[in-house]
Amino acid sequence: MSLLTALRTYVLADATVTALAGVRMYPRRLPQGPTLPAIAYQRIDTRREHDMDGPDGLPRARVQLSIWAASVAAAEELAAAVRGRLDGYKGAWGSVTVGSCLCVGERDLDDPETGRNAVVQDYMIQWRE
């Protein structure tokens, strides 16, 4: 299972998240005309360290979640649920062993053309390959 697939499965296993967004969590971008609230997720980059023997097998990915809703309050509510699920986590996401998942940034975003509001969260995730 890939890191992003495992992340999606883990986030959507949370009752609060699914009560707010159902299973509307999409790779990279929302579909055309989405039902809100919804989450788009993407890997921004992955850093792999090396030692004298080669790769250390503990990559760190920066993953961005864009949490979209029709109102600021709804975006903030879902963002809080997602952050509560992910921030500070270590353990297993299915077959993926996560050493740490830390929320390292959060910002507000709005789209004046559509009236949508978002909270964008950045996570640094270290896992074992």
Residue ranges and their predicted role:
Residues D53-D56, P112-T114:
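Short, solvent-exposed beta-strand/turn "edge" segments of beta-rich domains on protein surfaces
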Residues M1-P55, A73, E77, Y89-T97:
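Small/polar-rich, solvent-exposed N-terminal microdomains that initiate assembly or binding
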Residues R62, A79, C101-V104:
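Solvent-exposed, well-ordered amphipathic alpha-helical segments
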